[in-house]
A protein has these predicted regions:
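N-terminal [4Fe-4S]-dependent radical SAM core
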Residues: 11-58, 105
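Residues at the beta-strand->loop junction immediately N-terminal to the Walker
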Residues: 58-60, 114-115
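Local cysteine-cluster metal-coordination motifs and their immediate loop/turn environment
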Residues: 60-75
Length: 186
């Protein structure tokens, strides 16, 4: 992380000139790349400053319609584990209730519900999940639900997402080539 070097040197009280000289002389970084490091470090500092007292939440739904050939994530095939999704939501609600105590005085900047494929939940389960988020956490600035598999999206699920103020969905078909989709299990 080259920009971290710049940030660390700023924290040590070094001037931009001193940092630039050290990067070129000691680390053999080209002047153009040093300028890029300063730019990235400055942007990073602003983000870190603005992020004080804020948290981002990731809520994992480890179920998918099928297990894709290439997948390295922890996910479970719905055909095999379909009966476990309600029990998973029960456990998730207990965890949300417990964790919400720690976040009650913090500003939640973003919530990302990922997976697996969260939209592999049926409509009732998706409604339950988003209602739990509403119950335990304040409304974030950014609210995303991963809908990675287009075959899991229905008009009703989109209505549920909108009702719960989800501002963005992430759709990833991987490819538009049906032969490839068949090969990888999608």
């Amino acid at each position: 992380r080259p920009a971290k070097l710049v940030s660390d040197m700023w924290a040590e009280g070094k001037s931009d000139f001193e940092i630039r000289e050290e990067m070129v002389r000691k680390f053999k970084v080209s002047p153009d790349k040093v300028s890029l490091m300063f730019s990235v470090a400055s942007s990073e500092q602003k983000i870190l400053k603005d992020g004080k007292g804020k948290v981002s939440l990731y809520i994992g739904i480890p179920f998918c319609p099928t297990r894709c050939l290439y997948c390295s994530f922890t996910s479970y095939d719905m055909k095999r584990y379909n009966g476990k999704m309600d029990a998973y939501l029960d456990a998730l609600e207990k965890e949300m209730a417990h964790c919400s105590k720690y976040y009650q005085y913090k500003k939640i900047s973003s919530i990302y519900i990922g997976g697996g494929t969260p939209t592999s939940l049926n409509e009732q389960q998706l409604e339950r999940l988003l209602s739990m988020v509403d119950k335990y956490y304040s409304r974030p600035q950014e609210y995303t639900v991963e809908a990675g598999r287009p075959d899991t999206i229905t008009r009703e699920k989109l209505r549920i997402l909108r009702h719960h103020n989800v501002g963005r969905i992430s759709i990833n078909p991987q490819t538009l080539n049906q032969k490839t989709l068949d090969l990888i299990g999608r």
